[in-house]
Amino acid sequence: MKRKHIMIYAASLLVSVLAHAFFVKEWAEGRYMTGPGDGLAQMIVFKKLLFDQYTHGNFFYNYSFGLGGGTFSQLGYYFSASFLFLAVSAAVWLLQAVQLIGETDTLFWAESAVFISIFKLSLIIFTSASVFHYLLKHRAASFTGAVLYGVSIIYFRHEAYWEFFTDTMVWLPLLVLGAEKIIRERRPAWFIVACSLTLINNFYFAYINLIFIGIYVLFRWLIRLEPHEEKRWIQIRLFLVSGFISFGISAAAFVPVVYGFLNNLRPPYSQKIEWLNFDDNILFSSRIIIVPAAFLLFLFIISFYKNRVFRLFAGLSLLFILFHFSPYAASVFNGFSAPQNRFEYVLAFTIAGAAAAGLSQLSELKRKELLPAAAVVLLLYLYHIQRYKLDIWKPANESILLLLLMTIAALFAAAFAKKRAKMAVYGIIILSSLFVANSYQKYALSEGGDLDSVTKEYLTSEEYRGRESSELIRRLQKEDDDPLMRIDWMNGVRNNTPIIYGFNGFSAYSSILNKDLLAFYWNDLSIDMGRESVSRYASLGDRANLYSLLYGKYYMTEKTNEASVPYGFKKHLETEHYAVYENQYMLPFVKTADAIYSESELDRLPALAKEQAMLKGIILKDPSGKTEQTPKPSNLITKSDITAKQAQYQNGLLTVTGENGGELIITPKQPSSAPGDYYVSFYLKSKAKDKGFTLKVNDYVTTRKSNKSIYKTGVNNITVRVPKSGHISINLPKGTYELRNIALYEENYQTLKNAVMQNKTEKADKLNWNKNRLTFSYHLSKDQYIMLPIPYEKGWELKINGKTQKIEKADYAFIGFKAQKGDNHIELTYYPPYFKISAIISLVSLLLAVFYIRRKKPGSI
């Protein structure tokens, strides 16, 4: 690396450290640069999961991810293919190898967040400074613009809450460099490299980046920067061929990850989207972008528009400022879904480019131009103060006004003194950016966004990962060394609790999940999760049949919540605050069946009928042979009294009038004396436009989203299991609800007990799960189906006695397959969907890229 590049990177690193000054101070005091929401629930959790996997040579599948899943494809939106995460992981692994660091748990990843961010931001500043210098040939202006881009508030917002969002800020400048190399020099190498990197790292932000680069190229065709640029048809050919090669190179990562995204289940966004909304104050208080004063001043200096680079980036910035105020544009950048302002880093980049171009023209700055520009900008700030009724004496607002005045003063000095004042302008802009960044960290993120609550004390408390609960789980795992057993426990609403603690559980929280599992929860078995969400599944609704079917051996709970313990679970271990219950009706991990049920025949039957069918046999979508008659549990609602308390119920409408809520009470007239549970199901929808609510059914509590929430499932059919009692109370807060299709079923668990008796003599032999491969032997006395409590997903391959066999989706969401009489040596292997063919495409495309680049410009990129 040339000395000048070393100097630029050293300066980038120094600025990055200064930009993190507040968070470094917080780290020293035991507070971390990680959001209290998704930061603790996903970011540090997935890094722990993937680091543990990768360092053990397991790159594709994890049985502990929810009910089991392909982590390469389902976590591709996060870190699984991130070059920056892989680089950090390699460094951490080396530090572990020389014993400089210890356990890489969630606490470690929270503690290291600020240092990873410093490294990443230094790369962002370095790459963008290099690209701006290529465009401007002015190193100081380019570096100052790069600082504006790197330390923009959207970087710190995204890095703190959703760390992987900021990876794309490294690749965006490289894409621009690649486009410029094609337009100016007919050299495709940089574009192929940058496009491949962005496609591999994150398909979502690749989508945003490629939209931007398309817009950038269109602007470049309108604004020529060099007199001898390639003809457009040549550019188009180079872009198309280079883009095609880039997609090929990225295929091994891009294809499986995009398949994972397409295999997700999200209800369509049905709310009206506005074209324009100007509510956000981008000069003072926006949580996404604060427009730098220097950029605004430069916009109104007419002579700067003679510089084509300034004209280019100013035009792009004005367009993206308009996009910022357009929810419809935010929807387009979010894949035509709910509006999300995740694309604003592009605006930060174009503003930085315009500022850098303006700074390169300081020697041309005239006083007579600066005066009206300053007047217009001051009026803009005064307008925003008036419109948003701001208190200018608040520290944050006062600081922005002070920085504005300092910037104006520095520019006037530059207009008078020219060369002598230039460095003062650069210095004030950089210092202003650092000041705004650190102020934003303190007031918006730490105090306003609760990052100050993310402490070492919290991360080692019982609210997150405490000693008492950890030791209880370790005791249980030491006592029962079955590596496949599942424990149902969630610490509060943290669905990724099993990953945090290191056990196999029943819950997961991720933006991308197996759609068959989500459908299993939402629709097929109507399993209430205690919290409505499109990106989570949790527990099994305390339903004993499902625990036995899915190898749920233990149920852990706080002692204050023991009323929810499923039927057939007996207390096994306890501490002062927690108790673990053991399932007395366990079914084997490998289950066999010859009774076949049809999904379509069970479609309109209650969840209890489906559970009983799964216990008696196997449910298939398209069974080829004879099917069994479906179970038909009796609906007891016609033999029950229904009364309302602190509410009125008429024609399927429940109006709750009580200030503390009201209830609909179901009382069976002739209750059975046999032990067991009730399953109560109903359709429930709030009539309130924008208000979530809590539903209680006896002691069971669950929450439902607002009708306007983008995270609402749109599923309003609810089934709740309650222990047998004299009555069932459906309790709701004050309001009006559509409540209909009420049904009540009794479960005495005789079907479960029969299934346990029938499966006691059958047992898989030599069962071994190693990374992405499961092997076992099974002797059958006749041809039967074998079912496994492993989620069905594309990528599984099956061999029986060395021959490839077909895997079927059984019991709505799990693996099933036919096996023959006699000995069956079974091998199941998982690779990400289309991984093998995609890997071949990547290799061929890489070779093609080398040939193509050398052919275009030998020895040059």
From Swiss-Prot:
It is a multi-pass membrane protein. It comes from the Bacteria. It comes from Bacillus subtilis (strain 168). This is Uncharacterized protein YfhO. The keyword Cell membrane applies. Signal peptide: none annotated. Residues 738-766 form a coiled coil. The chain crosses the membrane at residues 4-24, 75-95, 106-126, 159-179, 199-219, 238-258, 282-302, 313-333, 343-363, 370-385, 396-416, 425-445, 833-853. GO terms for cellular component: plasma membrane. It is found in: Cell membrane. Keywords: Cell membrane, Coiled coil, Membrane, Transmembrane, Transmembrane helix. InterPro entries: Uncharacterised_YfhO (IPR018580).
